[in-house]
Design a protein with these regions (language model features):
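Bacterial N-terminal signal peptides
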Residues: 44-54
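Mature catalytic domains of secreted/periplasmic carbohydrate-active enzymes
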Residues: 59-475
Length: 475
């Protein structure tokens, strides 16, 4: 993951900036970056040619996309919420997933650390059940992070959790089987960057203290990755897709993306490719993801401000670390997390919320508690998140709108007044009520919008939702 800030900046509320709101300074999106992290080499412009609209939004690719992928993209677009998991050898040191880079640990020393990894309390049923209780529709887990250690059974290298550790089990296989049983889709995070493999050469902007010889075969490294991807796509049943990360480490390298993307779609036609390269979408990709940011906001400083036509995804840490960090107690509140989830939905994006399990395989109580509280909120308000898209009113400082069919959901995240005026025009509102208890909301339509009179100013809820039933036609 991108680890590009050395300071901790926290906001109580995340506000969204979209192309439609370029003139609304109060509505600019921000998701806090994380602590104590190295600066990544920025990517150069990609080689693909994108046609941009005046608003800076990439137009859909004209090449035909198979029906299976179109259906998978639509499923993803409607999913709303997923659970991200960063877990690996680095968890043992309790200092985040970049500890090998940050502490300049040589590869041989890190190999010894890997040989001690034994997460005996890992329970796939417990993890998937927690995701389900949280209301997550999918899980994305690190199959291999930048440290180069494979968290699955692979014949491409012995440097994996089955062959190298006393654990001798394949947690990804157990997780895949449990996801199938509980009806949750599984995505595999896969790092293109590798601080361990000798053929990751020439070296990129990171991993230079690993002690590897200054030689290697890049073509052989690409073949190694494709062999592992083939294993992930053939040994674990149907998967949701591959979530790539790390290409930014060598922006000028030939990553042979066309070959790799073709391989993935050939092995599993419905598998989605989700690249975390922080650029406008490239041919063959299926989802555009934004790290620690809402789409188009780029408050983190490394995401693109171009919003493409693909389904959107925004990933977020629950504190300031992706991997387990024993000293990171800067947990976001459930209110903040719900706010990010709602603002993502109002920006046509899913929220992928991260947890970093402990080295023994257990999940920190704080993370589990927040997930269950989000799940409880979704039990009541999920209808305004799942299977919706951004509503007719662009994101504002007070909140966002989402929509399904003729129903518009007005999300009040930061509004403590009984009166609210919104610029809703072109439709006639037939009924307004509060989601949850169904209390009627008085309203008046005017030529310039809709005036709403709420039953109360609110009692500190993370999000008050007004349901508007509409029909097309004059107001």
């Amino acid at each position: 993951m991108w680890l590009g800030r050395w300071f901790n900046r926290r906001l109580g509320t995340s506000l969204c900036q979209t192309p439609q709101l370029a003139d609304d300074v109060s509505a600019k999106g921000m998701i806090p970056p994380r602590l104590s992290v190295p600066v990544r080499v920025r990517c150069v412009a990609v080689s693909a040619v994108l046609l941009l609209s005046p608003l800076g939004i990439a137009q859909p690719q004209t090449s035909a996309v198979p029906a299976e992928r179109l259906a998978a993209r639509e499923w993803f677009r409607q999913a709303g919420f997923g659970m991200f998991i960063h877990w690996g050898v680095y968890s043992q040191l309790g200092d985040g997933e970049w500890v090998m880079q940050n502490r300049k640990i040589p590869a041989t020393t890190y190999e010894w650390l890997a040989s001690e990894f034994n997460p005996v309390k890992f329970d796939a049923h417990e993890w998937v059940s927690l995701a389900k209780a949280a209301g997550a529709r999918y899980i994305t887990i690190t199959s291999r992070h930048h440290d180069g250690f494979s968290m699955f059974a692979t014949r491409a290298t012995t440097y994996n959790i089955v062959d190298w550790t006393p654990f001798k089990r394949d947690p990804l296989k157990e997780l895949a089987d449990e996801c199938q049983r509980q009806g949750i889709k599984l995505f595999f995070y896969y790092s293109q960057l590798d601080w361990h493999h000798p053929d990751y050469f020439p070296r990129g902007g990171t991993g230079r203290a690993s002690g590897r010889p200054e030689n290697g075969d890049w073509t052989r490294y690409i073949a190694f990755m494709n062999q592992q991807l083939t294993e992930l796509l053939t040994h674990y049943g149907p998967i949701g897709g591959i979530w790539f990360d790390g290409m930014w480490d060598k922006p000028d390298a030939d990553w042979h993306l066309a070959d790799t993307y073709s391989l993935i779609h050939r092995l599993q036609p419905a598998a989605l490719i989700v690249p975390n390269h922080h650029r406008a979408p490239l041919p063959g990709e299926d989802v555009q993801t934004f790290e620690q940011d809402l789409p188009g906001a780029n408050t983190a400083g490394f995401n693109t401000s171009t919003i493409g036509a693909l389904p959107l995804d925004t990933s977020l840490t629950m504190n300031n670390s992706w991997g387990f960090n024993i000293t990171d107690t800067a947990w976001k509140s459930t209110r903040e997390i719900v706010g990010y989830l709602v603002r993502a939905a109002g920006s046509n994006a899913n929220l992928l919320l991260n947890i970093g399990p402990r080295p023994d395989g257990t999940i920190q109580p704080e993370a589990a508690q927040h997930l269950r509280e989000v799940g409880k909120w979704l039990q009541t308000y999920g209808t305004s998140i799942y299977n919706t898209h951004g509503g007719p009113i662009s994101p504002r400082s007070w909140g966002v709108t989402t929509q399904r069919g003729d129903t518009v959901f007005v999300h009040l995240l930061d509004w403590r007044d009984r009166l609210l005026a919104i610029p809703l025009v072109g439709v006639r509102v037939t009924r307004a009520s509060m989601l949850g208890d169904g209390t009627a909301v008085d309203f008046e339509q005017t030529p310039v919008g809709l005036r709403l009179t709420l039953p109360s100013v609110g009692a500190g809820e993370p999000d008050r939702v007004i349901v508007l039933r509409t029909v097309k036609g004059p107001q």
